[in-house]
């Protein structure tokens, strides 16, 4: 007679898979105003529209790192704007402005000073001559 050896076995584990709960609602009136909400599959969205056409809402989801991301927004006559979010990058701080002095103004050389004086003298003489005998008769 042959005896079968007792083989080791893996214990049986029973697991329950969590069931995704999904909720939603929608309401609308004859003026075009509406409100809706949807939640499920690790995401959520809520939105309302007023009689003036402006829309306010939020959406949220779980990003690949497991972080819950929420974004609140407004869409109206000024366009779509995010008014609050926890996933926006932060700008780096501006570096300190160094205290730098500019160069000193250029000083005129003696030749430039003499040329300016000669030009001013010629200009003044021409202005006096033009005042004495104008090209157009003034009555």
Swiss-Prot record:
Domain Chitin-binding type R&R positions: 31-92
Chain positions with Pyrrolidone carboxylic acid modification: 1
Keyword NAD recorded: no
PROSITE patterns reported for this sequence: CHIT_BIND_RR_2
Keywords: Cuticle, Pyrrolidone carboxylic acid
Membrane-crossing segments per the record: none
Cellular component, GO, one term: chitin-based extracellular matrix
Top-level taxon of origin: Eukaryota
One Pfam family hit: Chitin_bind_4
One MF term in the entry's GO annotations: structural constituent of chitin-based larval cuticle
Name of the protein: Cuticle protein 6
